[in-house]
């Protein structure tokens, strides 16, 4: 009788993906309020995050996002470059309002600015790099969800998701899991159905990689043109090493210039026009 095959539960599969993306890798520093999410510490002094708490807080954050009736009133921010693409992809599938890049001061507090918005929920990628948005949210009593590392301050953060918020793979996976959980709760995606969106689409990509591709394509195009040219026989070039016999023994430049007009006989005709 064949042995029964073991199948991972959805939570176990999510934790396996977190381990692959190094979501559990923290920093050498740890905040006092983040100490309860730390599982252990390596010999190098790097703190490891308990992924059970990460998965639990991720589900709590997804429930908070679903409670907002209008998805556009959920603002997702990321001043860190590694999280810009993940924020845009998350907002595309969830329907939230993304702000990738620099946060304009006064977005939540100054009504005169053109970028003024009044959201009901804020999702931040890093409490340190997104400190301006978190500070403004405290002025307007706006609840905040944030991806927090072991050294992240929890000031103005209501729901902290403990994870590695500095790696591009970790940030992409966390937003992918959060978007999938939101779709589960909205009943737009069944839990027994796999999501056809790959995690790779949430990864940040270096713009320099796209700048090098056109040069490579131009070189290959030139090589193809050279290879497609027909083999035309080349005509032999004249031998310039041969010397005219009439000038072989002549060393006088006057003899060499025989038959040519004398340069000294040139008359300036400009005086005639004057």
Swiss-Prot record:
Entry annotated with the keyword Nucleotide-binding: no
Keywords carried by this UniProt record: Cytoplasm, Ribonucleoprotein, Ribosomal protein
Main localization, broad class: cytoplasm
Molecular function (Gene Ontology), one example: structural constituent of ribosome
Residues making up the signal peptide according to the UniProt record: none
Record-level GO cellular component terms: cytosolic small ribosomal subunit
PROSITE patterns associated with the record: RIBOSOMAL_S2_1
GO biological process: ribosomal small subunit assembly; translation
Top-rank lineage group of the source organism: Eukaryota
Subcellular localization, as worded in the UniProt entry: Cytoplasm
Family of this protein: Belongs to the universal ribosomal protein uS2 family.
Function: Required for the assembly and/or stability of the 40S ribosomal subunit. Required for the processing of the 20S rRNA-precursor to mature 18S rRNA in a late step of the maturation of 40S ribosomal subunits.
NCBIfam families: uS2_euk_arch
Subunit structure: Component of the small ribosomal subunit. Mature ribosomes consist of a small (40S) and a large (60S) subunit. The 40S subunit contains about 33 different proteins and 1 molecule of RNA (18S). The 60S subunit contains about 49 different proteins and 3 molecules of RNA (25S, 5.8S and 5S). Interacts with ribosomal protein S21.
Protein name per Swiss-Prot or TrEMBL: Small ribosomal subunit protein uS2
